[in-house]
Amino acid sequence: EGVGHTAQGGDELMPLRSDPLPRMAGHLSFMRAQSKEICKVRAGDLAVLGLPFEDTSAPYAGQSLAPRALRETSVYFGWHANPQFSHPVDIDARQDIKTDGLHERLCDLGDIAPGSEEAIHAALMTATCQINRVGACALLLGGSDRLSVTVQNALQGCQTVQLGGTPCDARDFHIAPLPNGSATICNSDTAAQLAGFSQWRDASKPLFVRFDLSVFETSLSALCDRPRLGGCNLDTVTQWLSTLGQHRVSAIMLTGLNPTRPGMGVVKVGQRLMVTALL
């Protein structure tokens, strides 16, 4: 009855997607990015690096599969956004999007190899330093609080913006953090927070963005290990990412995705696509 009412009301309905979804075989890359060795990363590049490791402090195992899950699902988004195809459209809104320069800058460095904890942190430190040294931005798929400290150490004197997650450092700028019993809940007035961010930001320092899926309201965080009451809606997160995108960002770490959590497959794919589109 509700569907019939919507149709009769004259609202514009989203057209059904008739194009076949791609079936990829072999090596997957994020957004169909070109594979590249780290020594060939150039200034202005967005260098994707996977961190397929479990966060032992997280409530559930499965985060190690997040980089692969994002690469697999981002193929669908990249298939529509890649300028080599004739129909670059947003997969949900069906609106034209501009991808000029994206695929020239986007490159996939693969994953950091499994090993001892010391070796993993050393490899992440070296990679982050090298990417930052040439003036590129590191997009880290996966991570943890401890791995984020390694990134901060690599970006000496950096400022950190944290979307979601549990506050760790009062000097960081927190957007919709998870309540931990002692932290003050951030003002929900987005305009006031944006003004506060402008005052907090020091352009002379590197900027590190920690993007945890717990930033989203519960209805959008089905795959997050730490579901929450409240949180931001999609428009608010998009607004924040657009604001951050106006600054020179040295590294972005995406955490909180656990593709093994039970739930409907369509919800899982939808959330991965949403995160891919936002990034």
Enumerate the language-model features and the residues they cover.
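Gly/Ser/Thr-rich helix-start
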Residues: 51, 143-144
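Mid-sequence, gly/pro-rich, charge-dense loop/helix-turn segments that line enzyme active sites
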Residues: 160-185
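Glycine-rich phosphate/pyrophosphate-binding beta-alpha loops
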Residues: 57
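Catalytic cores of soluble, metal-dependent hydrolases
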Residues: 4-47, 60-61, 65-138, 146-154, ...
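Short, hydrophobic/glycine-enriched beta-strand segments
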Residues: 45-51, 161-162
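Generic enzyme active-site microenvironment
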Residues: 143, 162-164, 210-212
